[in-house]
């Protein structure tokens, strides 16, 4: 019996009912085609970021192949072997132990390279969500992806990459929505607190994060609650780490440095001839020759520095004496200390990167054509076995101060440098493959402009402009806080790395805000004329002063054409002003 035509499919078969599964042979190719089309469309829309991401991936693969199993630094030994009590917390040691359970040091650097790529993607996406155009968001992420100093750090067994990643994670969480949600605030606080267990300089980051939680809240109730939640979640990992430290070592602290950590900085700045000090503290004053030769880092750590050679009078605390010395220098000569710190902070904007007298050599953060060695700490044998020197805490009188042993075979054992690749990476890094100082300066100026825009009342009346300015403020304040705070103990090019993932995004957001404002003004002039634009601006200021959003009816000079022109900015710089919405990515 023939079925009615209405009950059959195009080939005479029964049509698929609501409960019937689609044919695998026909559905799978269609799904693959649609997935491929979506991927192709995504790549076309984000072609610049895709190209930068691929370039960053290639550079990281080359670094991974060129230096095996990984690059080691002096401080690496305290994380691998507990070689000496560190001046930084040991949170990074937990990361190392987790990865070394399943791989060697090469696996550690592979993960660190992936973290570097993830930071670039995170910066790009969050800038898009806050209204930056694609090309500008991609350029803001480029330094993280392509900077040679960042690549070298990722290839080194050091905590810097994880410190940066935790900062980026916190910023992304806070900026994911125009008004940060309680869960995002709590997670961001935890990320920043964890950053302190990796590098103690992260302590300062609670300030810009709490300020943003207050300013972006939208109401006093949400502001107070957000700031309190941020501080509590920030404190949780820090107190947990200090409790573990107390249980293990008997010291409820983050690190052993304490109040003596800025001795090198203040001793470099001190004019001891005019200082009023007790006679027993005079020995802590370095000579001009010691300042020139040792610098702040050497004054803190060198075996021939006044701090290392100092012996406190009987019955007096050496730590207390050093603390009093630093306090007296700061009290009596604050401008000298501030001047030295400011001068070092400004070195980030220099056209070229050089090692000044007393600096930690910048070559330590540059790719070398051979496996790097450090006297008494790291060297390679004739058969390329990595030899590490572990400093003895209590050496026997007249005995050796170091004990030497090969790097554990489970960690990688032998050094293997592919010299052509190493030479390429070194040439890339030294010949333009880094973020130049003038670019940092431009980003700083634009970030400052975007941050100061928040003092204008009309910024708060336009959702898009408010979101751009607030995001710019968070990136800029984070950059300023961490860079200046890191330079207080001493200057090192290593400590400038957080600028890579904070200053360019701040500058990009500041520029996006300027472009948005300029585009709005041009469209209003084109539609309604210059006189209408002036009246429109005045109406917007009045609306902002009254606490309401600017609307087309707020000024009689606005026309339907002007409103349409302003709405069209979503194609370029603008995002949406609704709290839960974001521009299409």
Predicted regions and their residues:
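Transmembrane signal-anchor helices characteristic of membrane glycosylation enzymes that use polyprenol
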Residues: 45-71, 145-146, 233-244
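Loop-to-helix entry region of an early transmembrane alpha helix in multi-pass inner-membrane enzymes
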Residues: 90, 94, 102-121, 153
